[in-house]
Amino acid sequence: RRQRQMCIRDSDDTALKSGDVVLFDIGGRNRNYCSDMTRTFFWGEPDEETARIYDIVRRANEAAEALIAPGVRMCDLDRAARDVIENAGYGKYFTHRLGHSIGLQDHEPGDVSLVNEQVVEPGMTFSIEPGIYLPGRTGVRIEDLALVAENGVEILNAYPHDPVRLD
């Protein structure tokens, strides 16, 4: 994945230092169905730009999630999140689609992207995962799973969007 090459590295035995950003992308299975969630944490106090980026990504996530309902197009969800990021001046650093469908596989057909005009329907489950990645410097992503209901959406992740310091 392009974002991995830009700012995310696999774990190793490097000691964390104050200001480091730690991104957890985790998932599991229950009755053969997959889950997927990403949260970004800080080791110590984040620098000013990283804190600002975190807030932008959180607002982008929440803008897309607020729009999810039957009849809305996938591309409109991506546009809602992307507009928040672009209006903040970080558009070129949001380098991937907004999300992906999920079910028996962790990535199923049905991208939440600018090019997918598919209409959201009840029963669909997909991720909402905006991110900003500054090459060699920092990166933030917040990912939730959304289950579309008849009259809206149920966010399947219970973990909050508030920034968390791990130290």
Which sequence ranges carry the predicted segments?
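Active-site neighborhoods and metal-handling regions in enzymes and metal-associated proteins
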Residues: 2-167
